[in-house]
Amino acid sequence: MLKSADPTLERQAGALLLVPLLCLVIPAFAQSLYKYRGADGDWVYSDRAPPDDEAVEVRDLPGGPASPRVTVAHRFADGRLQLAATNDYHAPVELILGIEDLQNAERPDPLQSLRWVLAAKSETELMSLGATASAGTPKIVYRYTWLAGDPATEHAPDRPYRAPFAVARAFPVSQAFPNTVTHTGADSRHAVDIVMPVGTGVYAARGGTVFEVTGTNFRGGLHPERDAAAANLVRILHEDGTYGEYAHLNWNSIRVKPGDIVRRGEYIADSGNTGFSSGPHLHFAVIRNIGMRVESVPVVFEGANGSEIVPATGTQLTAY
C-alpha cells in the first residue's frame, strides 16, 4: 500500500519569517550494483558482493527523484494559529490530525472531525485557532497520518478491464482469488499474479492519471523484510477513485511519470522480478481506500467479443 507519513511536530508558533528557498533535485544513491565474472565466465550483475575476493566492479545506482509528499505545517499570524496541509500527489489522500498538546490558543470544536480528504495537488487550510488572552505565545504539538484515496470511493468501471499486456498474447494466471497463497491481506486478496518473462510489455488495464512510480530497484528475492520494499511499480488513479497497481516491474523500464494521463492499452513499463517475488511475473490489483485502510476489489477482464473473464488460478489470460 501507499506509504503513510506519521511525523510528530512540535514548534513554538511566533513571528512568521518568510525565507526564499532554493530547491535542488539530488538523486539518492539507494543500491550498489556488483559486476563480476561468474563460475561459468559470464558476467553477473547483483546487489550482493561475490563470495570471494575476485575482481569486482561496484556502482552506486541513483535512487531517482524524491517521492511526492503530504505535509502539515502551522504558523501564527494576525493573532491566529493556522494549520494547513499540502498534498503533492496527483491523487486525493485521506488525512487524520491528532493534537497532542495545545497551549495559549483556542481548542477546536469538540464536534469537529479532525479528518479531511485532500484533493490532488492541493493546499488545504485545516483550522484557524484564535490566541487566548494569556501572554504566552501559542504552542502546538500534533501528529498526522495519511493514506492515498478518497474513502467515499465506489468501484464502478464502465467496462471490463483490459488484460495488462499486448493484444493477442496469453499468459498463465499463477494466483487469483479465492486460490491465494501470498495474497492474504485485504490489499492483495483480489490481486492477480500473471506469469510472464522479464521484459514483457505491460499495458494499462484502464485509463487514468499516474500518481506514483518506483522504477530504480533491480533486485528480487524471497526475504519479506529485505525484498518487499524493492518492487518497482506504477499506480494509476481511475475516474471512480480506485487505482490500479502494477508491481514487480523491470528496472529502469517505466515509461510514465506522475501526472501523466494514460489511456487504456497504453504501454507503461516492462514486467520484471523485483521485490518480494519467487519468479518473473506481473502483480496487478485494483485498490480503494475504505477509511485509512486499503482493500483490493474483484476485477473481471474483457474476453472475446466483449465477454467477461473472471481470472482464476491455473488458467490462461488473453488480451483482446
Regions found by a protein language model. Give the residues of each.
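Acidic, glycine-rich catalytic/binding loops that coordinate metals and/or anionic ligands
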Residues: 158-174, 203, 226-229, 254-263, ...
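Surface-exposed, glycine-biased beta-strand/turn segments
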Residues: 114-230
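Short histidine-centered loop motifs in beta-beta connectors
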Residues: 197, 203, 238-265
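Short, cationic interaction patches enriched in Lys/Arg with P/S/T/G and frequent prolines
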Residues: 2, 29-125, 134-139
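Active-site loop architecture of trypsin-fold serine endopeptidases
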Residues: 217-226, 271-283
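Bacterial N-terminal signal peptides
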Residues: 15-25
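N-terminal secretory signal peptides that target proteins for export/translocation
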Residues: 1-11
